[in-house]
């Protein structure tokens, strides 16, 4: 898009430019294997595999669906995108939503984080409760 994109504000659960030590390590490893930056599909796959691994560990290797679901409820961990919890009621992800603005950093246009909202639950399910 070029400089016309400067100032555009977006909202997402992930951008490879998110500033954290864990994300920097994730981006470096991802680039080494795939020769490109990760996106929200990449981080979703990474976190999904983390959840499966942790649930299997918690069940002692039991692969029964009910045991794995019970193990996943309420699970929390630090992801490259930030803190994540699995809602014990809905089993949905509770996560930070980041607001980014396109800025020129050196000679690159990057999404620079300008704000965030922590512990965001599925807004539709939250409204349906009331």
Could you tell me what each predicted segment is?
Residues 1-130:
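Extracytosolic ligand-binding ectodomains
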